[in-house]
Amino acid sequence: MPKTAFLILKSPQELDPTHTMKRFADSQDASAILVEDGVYHAMLARPAERLAKVAKDVLVSGDDLEARGFQASDLKMGRVVDYAGIVECIMERTDRTITV
């Protein structure tokens, strides 16, 4: 199965991306990239637990986290990256990108 980056833009209240992620990638081949309101998936316990089951790597946009008044210590999971880190994941470590 191809390595897939899932770009998650919406909050957990708007969307549970895990169903789509399971359909298109094995958890060992999936990376979740949380941007915009998608960063809330890494800050709330239940969404973070669900995401941990379907993605090997979870990247959280530091700029989007900061724009919402939060910091890395507020995360339940994942690691904060800058846009260069997001681009590197998409271009160098995955075969395709799916926006959910």
Name each region found by the language model:
Residues 64-70:
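Conserved phosphate/oxyanion-binding catalytic-loop motifs
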Residues 20-26, 48-50, 75:
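Short, solvent-exposed amphipathic alpha-helical segments in soluble enzyme
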Residues 12-28, 32:
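Histidine-anchored nucleotide/phosphate-binding helix
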Residues 30-36, 57-64:
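Short internal beta-strands
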Residues 70-100:
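C-terminal structural segments of small proteins and small subunits
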Residues 3-17, 35-41:
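Short, glycine-rich nucleotide/cofactor-binding loops
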Residues 38-53:
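N-terminal beta-loop-helix "entrance" segment that forms/cooperates
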Residues 28, 55, 94-95:
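Short, well-ordered alpha-helix to beta-strand connector turns
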